[in-house]
Amino acid sequence: MPRYGDVAFTWDVVNEPIEAGVLPDGLRPSPYHQAFGPDYIVRAFEDARMLAPTAGLFVNEFGIDHDLPEENEKRLLLLRLLEKLKKKGVPIDGLGIQAHLDLAKQPYFREAILADFLNDVGSLGLQVRISELDVREANPLQPVADRDTQVAQAVGRYLDVALANRAVGSVTCWGLSDRYSWLSSWGRPAGLNRGLPLDSDFNPKPMANVLNIAFASLFNNA
């Protein structure tokens, strides 16, 4: 940050701070927590604001997209953290939702739950950025056309909710081409994952079309 400061228009100041059931405050154990206690987050944002007076300063978190017990608890803990930071006057501007979608969890995706969470975050005066969008496949042994359709449908369902909320200001995919997707080594099972807009030869897939339609609709209705 000392080098780039406000050249970057947003900063991920604190990444993935929440982990349920470990520490009493719901924070993830880390060297920062060990050194400074739970207020390390406050200190991080205050220092970041001094280095970047006009940039957007964000918390970034994963695993908060589905109606599953562990994700429901994580959303609640995250919302409590955001409320606490706002009450303390901490210079936080928003929340990054990583949105690493998982086709194995699609039966547990509830539009209303995501919409309510976005409303709760927005009501705190915070922005939301979809920061790491991609899709983990459940069954890469299916025909490619079926796989691509499932990925596109999952992204479409998610963006229909996210982009309808005024707090959501941007969407960033966690890569462009399947060739370089982290999910190709972390996938389930291992192998080339088709969860990004372009295939391994950089040809657009149905997910790219869904993104184009979603953004075009957003701008047309602005």
Predicted regions and their residues:
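Generic structural signal for well-ordered alpha-helical scaffold segments
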Residues: 1, 82-86, 159-160
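Sparse, context-dependent recognition of short Cys/His-centered cofactor- or disulfide-binding micro-motifs
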Residues: 75, 80-82, 113, 156
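Loop-centered beta-sheet repeat module
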Residues: 39, 55-63, 71-73
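Aromatic- and acid-rich polysaccharide-binding/catalytic face
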Residues: 9, 15, 50-61, 78-108, ...
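Aromatic-rich peripheral "rim/lid" segments of glycoside hydrolase catalytic domains that contact
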Residues: 3-6, 12-38, 43, 47, ...
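Surface-exposed cleft-lining segments at the edges of enzyme active sites
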Residues: 25-35, 63-70, 94-108
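Short, compositionally biased strand/turn segments
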Residues: 66-76, 145-150
